[in-house]
């Protein structure tokens, strides 16, 4: 199994690469790519960790050597948020970066599963889909927006609030991956209940958690370490499913049946070909139903922005 990380010299990329070097199954290959010249050195640094995962690093304009034979590609390349910016302010720079990298994926490893971490995810996933479609290689079961950070944050905050072990809480999060489009289904956590006010406050905290980190880092970056952990969790789940493990479920932002929007984050059963089944979002509380209806315009606008970036 070969995993490629694009944007591997950045804060998320390095954290992700470290976790994958330690946790990928024995015999896996890990290839790191970034435009930054330090990237081969990051790979050498990680190569000294004693795990049976082969690692190589590549830098420069051309990601092709890193992509050859990749089964899974995780894209974290792009610029990070600064205080006062929201995820959509990143669009102007990151849209072009994602488009360029996905064009190279379409040529070099068109059958790979691709996980997009680069923000704004609501939009960059739509860009990736249109690029792959243009190249004639789009498979909607193999393109994912990685929203796992919303899930792990939800798990942490719920556990704190309710005095649970964080490892015992699993919160499904649906919708998208910014602001109001992030909707944790707090009503679906077994053995935990919330007043409507608690649910509203907690939902807001989960939606704004990224901004909390950006502000706390005081201009020094955005969420890199928790995002690296989230991306590793998603990437490792995907690898396990691709290798034939059954019952692997993760939430991610994918093209579905279009019931709510063309792309929508929901629980997915993963399998040997990527998405095996898009699972139902289940029964929502009145608050969740209102939140879902209230986000759809924003989500659809984000998606259209990405589609038009490629098609216009």
Curated annotation (Swiss-Prot):
CDD domains per record: MDH_glyoxysomal_mitochondrial
Q: Name one GO biological process term.
A: tricarboxylic acid cycle
Q: What is this protein called?
A: Malate dehydrogenase
Keyword Metal-binding present in the record's keywords: the answer is no
**Which NCBIfam families does the entry mention?**
MDH_euk_gproteo
Which InterPro entries is this protein grouped with?
L-lactate/malate_DH (IPR001557), Lactate/malate_DH_C (IPR022383), Lactate/malate_DH_N (IPR001236), Lactate_DH/Glyco_Ohase_4_C (IPR015955), Malate_DH_AS (IPR001252), Malate_DH_type1 (IPR010097), Malate_DH_type1_bac (IPR023958), NAD(P)-bd_dom_sf (IPR036291)
Q: Which family does it belong to?
A: Belongs to the LDH/MDH superfamily. MDH type 1 family.
């Amino acid at each position: 199994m070969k995993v490629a990380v694009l944007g591997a010299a950045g804060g998320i990329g390095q954290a992700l690469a470290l976790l994958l070097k330690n946790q990928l199954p024995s015999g896996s290959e890990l290839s790191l790519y970034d435009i930054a010249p330090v990237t081969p050195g990051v790979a050498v640094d990680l190569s000294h960790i004693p795990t049976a995962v082969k690692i190589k690093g590549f830098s420069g304009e051309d990601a092709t050597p890193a992509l050859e034979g990749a089964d899974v590609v995780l894209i974290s390349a792009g610029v990070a948020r600064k205080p006062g910016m929201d995820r959509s302010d990143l669009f102007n720079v990151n849209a072009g970066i994602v488009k360029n990298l996905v064009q190279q994926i379409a040529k070099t490893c068109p059958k790979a599963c691709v996980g997009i971490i680069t923000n704004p995810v609501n939009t960059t996933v739509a860009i990736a889909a249109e690029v792959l479609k243009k190249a004639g290689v789009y498979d909607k079961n193999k393109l994912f927006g990685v929203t796992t950070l919303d899930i792990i944050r939800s798990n942490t905050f719920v556990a704190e609030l309710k005095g649970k072990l964080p490892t015992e809480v699993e919160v499904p999060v649906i919708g998208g991956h910014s602001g109001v489009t992030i909707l944790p289904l707090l009503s679906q956590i077994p053995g935990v209940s919330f007043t409507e006010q608690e649910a509203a406050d907690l939902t807001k905290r989960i939606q704004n958690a990224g901004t909390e980190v950006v502000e706390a880092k005081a201009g020094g970056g955005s969420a890199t370490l928790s995002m690296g952990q989230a991306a590793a969790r998603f990437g490792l789940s995907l690898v396990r499913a691709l290798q034939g493990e059954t019952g692997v479920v993760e939430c991610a932002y994918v093209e579905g049946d279009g019931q709510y929007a063309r792309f929508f984050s929901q629980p997915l059963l993963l399998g040997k070909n990527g998405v095996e089944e898009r699972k139902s979002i289940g029964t929502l509380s009145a608050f969740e139903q209102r939140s879902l209806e209230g986000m759809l315009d924003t989500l659809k606008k984000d998606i259209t922005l990405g589609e038009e970036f490629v098609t216009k």
